[in-house]
Amino acid sequence: MRTQGKRAVSAAALLLATAGAVVAGGGPASATAADCSNGANGFVTVSDNASGAVARHIEPYPEFIINLEYGTIGGVQRGFARLRGRTVQGDKVWMDWTRDAGRTWIQCGPFTVSYLFAPKTSAAQRTSRDANWRFRACGRGSGANESFCTTWW
């Protein structure tokens, strides 16, 4: 029994050390909305009324819908984040973009909802067949402490 206890403690220590290394290695590099709009860093501005095919979807609160969508914009297939539903002024949406399968990423935004029930989109970035080039959509309700993100696509 004593040996099993030591193994369990050793396994737990290894798991914690490994998890800590993974968390310590990744993270976002923030970019403001200006860093992701009007052609900056390859991003293009998208109308807040734009919609595309839904690649990922979460609804953390009833009718608070965060989508990762894609569509042809200016002749190029691009991905973007979209917040819709029962939005209020101050709700935020952004898109995370990675070129290394999620080890590090750029947070493009946040973009802020300006009035009640208004949809809001992030800027859009071209898609790629490269498996390391991924997006996820994220959002946070006005005054909330917790953010929600889709899985990577």
Task: Give, region by region, the residue ranges found by the protein language model.
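N-terminal prepro-regions of secreted/extracellular proteins
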Residues: 1-51
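Post-signal peptide N-terminal regions of Sec-secreted extracellular proteins
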Residues: 30-153
